[in-house]
Regions:
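Surface-exposed peri-terminal alpha-helical interaction modules
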Residues: 2-13, 18-167
Length: 167
């Protein structure tokens, strides 16, 4: 007799390994929820989005370093700059970008709980929302909008990541 899940997966165009289990199997006879894994295209887009988000983050760090040095004086070296990025509230607004890159990293490298298709779409949506340059938005969106106005390089990279996030 054929496993009903195998038949359902094959009928939907997938293979049984295209489904992953979310949540523990209950001792009460309930089955864990099975979710479709992210497609190869979604995983590739996540990897590309991560790479481009890192480029945006680097460009923002460079732009913010210039802004900081204009306001407060020259930063001695890269080590001092790193300490400022970590500890100075001036750079707090950049944390959502770093956290998004880290989240994509963690989820795409988790072999025990692979990224699901719905989760991949959610990550794309979260990144799109974060990258909305809005002078009236949250701190990141306001300062991102300002940085885009002053850095053509950043604007080009931001456009590239936007295209990837929108599929």
């Amino acid at each position: 007799m054929t496993d009903p899940q195998e038949g359902a997966s094959a009928a939907e165009g997938g293979r049984p390994q295209d489904v992953h289990t979310a949540g523990p199997s209950g001792g009460d006879g309930t089955m864990p929820l099975e979710l479709p894994r992210a497609t190869a295209d979604e995983l590739q887009r996540l990897e590309l989005a991560r790479t481009l988000l890192l480029k945006v983050h680097r460009a923002l760090l460079e732009a913010e370093r210039v802004r900081y040095e204009k306001a407060r004086g020259r930063i001695e070296n890269n080590s001092a700059f790193l300490q400022l990025v970590i500890n100075d509230p001036w750079f707090d607004w950049l944390r959502p970008m770093a956290q998004m890159v880290l989240l994509i990293d963690e989820r795409t490298s988790d072999k025990k709980a692979p990224v699901g298709s719905a989760e991949a779409r959610s990550l794309f949506a979260r990144a799109r929302d974060m990258l909305k340059a809005d002078p009236d938005g949250d701190a990141f969106q306001r300062l991102f909008a300002d940085a885009l106005q002053h850095s053509p390089t950043l604007a080009v990279i931001a456009r590239q990541v936007s295209m990837v996030l929108h599929g």
